[in-house]
């Protein structure tokens, strides 16, 4: 009678015979690593063995996080061990969130608040501030700037005929080296407005004396208070000096105010 041959089965068949189903999940910790072994069926209805390896690290967390980890589990996970369960929890990477105030976001997108696009520019030192707030106001730098502007305006008035444009008679006379029929040009008068109430004749003279010689000046004052009414008239001996004064002083900051300078209009207009 032939003997019965012993047929060796696979480890999966042996596990099925021993346990009558899937074996339980096991965990072992060695050399700072945690090994989790579990068994499950794949899509072909075959038993598979899955081994997950975790590296154990220690880190400092906020008190609220540490307290939350001590909470008791509930439901189907009531009997689970501390820490995440691979059956119900998927551990992903930490996501860092940054909360931004909406007002700060609006300010960041405001082009007017961009420091690289500063709209203020000083006429004296070319700094990023208004001319009225310039620390060099009234110093030698301010004086040199006014003198350069006066020379540039006078030079532009002399070079005007080269452009082919209309040349007033008074400029033609000045180019010829004379003042014309009259000894002076009475039309070289300007009106300076937006002056402060504390303005005096001495201040007015100090303001325009570096530009060119004047024939007369008039500072409008209130009859009752004697304070400046906010405007004044200055008559220069030459019209080119008056043009230079308009170019220099119009928009110039003086006594915390921005001056407005224009040609004086005749009284009959």
UniProtKB/Swiss-Prot annotation:
Family: Belongs to the eIF-3 subunit G family.
Keywords: Cytoplasm, Initiation factor, Protein biosynthesis, RNA-binding
Residue ranges annotated for the RRM domain, each copy included: 188-266
One Pfam family it belongs to: eIF3g
GO BP annotation list: formation of cytoplasmic translation initiation complex
A GO term from the CC aspect: eukaryotic 48S preinitiation complex
HAMAP family: eIF3g
Main localisation: cytoplasm
Native source organism of the sequence: Drosophila grimshawi
Functional note: RNA-binding component of the eukaryotic translation initiation factor 3 (eIF-3) complex, which is involved in protein synthesis of a specialized repertoire of mRNAs and, together with other initiation factors, stimulates binding of mRNA and methionyl-tRNAi to the 40S ribosome. The eIF-3 complex specifically targets and initiates translation of a subset of mRNAs involved in cell proliferation. This subunit can bind 18S rRNA.
Top-level taxonomy: Eukaryota, Metazoa, Ecdysozoa, Arthropoda, Hexapoda
InterPro entries assigned to the protein according to its UniProt record, in alphabetical order: eIF3_g, eIF3g_N, eIF3G_RRM, Nucleotide-bd_a/b_plait_sf, RBD_domain_sf, RRM_dom
Name of this protein: Eukaryotic translation initiation factor 3 subunit G-1
Top-level taxon of the source organism: Eukaryota
Subunit: Component of the eukaryotic translation initiation factor 3 (eIF-3) complex. The eIF-3 complex interacts with pix.
Any GO molecular function: RNA binding
Subcellular location: Cytoplasm
PROSITE patterns tied to this protein: RRM (PS50102)
């Amino acid at each position: 009678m032939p003997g019965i041959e012993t047929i060796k089965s696979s480890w999966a068949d042996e596990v099925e015979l021993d346990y009558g189903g899937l074996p339980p999940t096991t965990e072992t910790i060695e050399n700072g690593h945690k090994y989790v072994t579990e068994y499950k069926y794949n899509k072909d209805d075959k038993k598979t063995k899955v081994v997950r390896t975790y590296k154990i690290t220690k880190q400092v967390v906020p008190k609220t996080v540490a307290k939350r980890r001590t909470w008791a589990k509930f439901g189907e996970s009531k009997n689970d061990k501390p820490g995440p369960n691979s059956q119900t929890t998927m551990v992903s990477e930490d996501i860092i969130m940054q909360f931004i105030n909406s007002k700060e976001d609006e300010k960041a997108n405001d082009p007017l608040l961009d420091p690289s696009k500063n709209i203020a520019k000083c006429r004296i030192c070319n700094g990023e501030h208004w001319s009225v707030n310039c620390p060099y106001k009234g110093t030698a730098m301010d004086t040199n700037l006014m003198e350069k502007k006066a020379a540039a305006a006078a030079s532009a008035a002399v070079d005007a005929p080269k452009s082919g444009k209309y040349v007033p008679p008074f400029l033609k006379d000045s180019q010829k080296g004379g003042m014309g029929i009259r000894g002076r040009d009475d039309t070289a008068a300007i009106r300076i407005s937006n002056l402060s109430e504390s303005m005096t004749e001495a201040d007015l003279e100090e303001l325009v004396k570096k530009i060119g010689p004047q024939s007369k000046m008039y500072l409008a004052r209130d009859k009752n208070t004697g304070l400046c009414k906010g405007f004044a008239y200055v008559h220069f001996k030459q019209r080119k000096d008056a043009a230079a004064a308009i170019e220099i002083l119009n928009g110039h900051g003086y006594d915390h105010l921005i001056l407005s300078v224009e040609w004086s209009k005749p009284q009959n207009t």
